[in-house]
């Protein structure tokens, strides 16, 4: 079984069964890698990795993962490619389609990724945009499933800025029947269009996706507490102002105590300790942050294999 669409731009585009398929294949690939079993399903394939944003986890996990699948990744930053000098996205898409077998892009504008996929004849994977971060959110589902076995009916609370991470988590939760609350200050809540789409998805899986300003009210009964940086790339000038606004939304021992006793803590990294999360919590026994980071490798391998391999895994 493969994915219905040739691209992975948003979790909203995935069918419920496709999310389960990605998680299942990720588990198989993780076992194979841990057991030293060969799994070079993309031998002879080439992946172009386009980066407009700095990266540690995205670049490393995609590059290493594609090597482990037997393929050859090529890294192209804006300053090392013509797209960074103003070449139309549609031209880049059509040229790369004649050279490589897939494209992963990490950039600012989501519209650019949509345009890239429109004109490319090969799979395009959204490695992150200002609107969405689907590979991370699928990784988060995989991590929660590893720790808690069952996803449906769980309660996840995202605390902080209603950013690209919050958006993709809402889509992800809705697809698997997880209840999700976004605890965000007024003026920093998720995009209303994304919220409406996630709530529509949730209506088919019997869960709820809501937004709440009162963070203590939001976290009651939470199985998962999740946060992200308060100022994303491109928002550095807002950092000081955001620190004051988001101060009540820090994940600390007091907030964690309001969740379920067995709740886990997640962060997509990089973490700014003492701001959105305290050092004692991220280093504490309920933190799964570094397991979560590792799982980017396994989930993205599953995504690449499902999009770029003709045969059934």
Model features per residue range: what roles?
Residues 1-14:
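Generic N-terminal amphipathic, Lys/Arg-enriched alpha-helix
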Residues 34-36, 40-145, 273:
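Phosphate/diphosphate ligand-binding glycine-rich loop within oxidoreductases
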Residues 42-47, 152-154, 262:
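Phosphate-coordination loops involved in phosphoryl transfer and adenosine-cofactor binding
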Residues 52-64, 148-227:
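Glycine-rich phosphate/diphosphate-binding loop of Rossmann-like nucleotide-binding domains
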Residues 69, 99, 119-120, 176, ...:
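Short, structured coil segments at secondary-structure junctions
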Residues 199-279:
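Rossmann-like adenosine-cofactor binding region
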Residues 262-263, 268-313:
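Adenosine-phosphate binding glycine-rich loop
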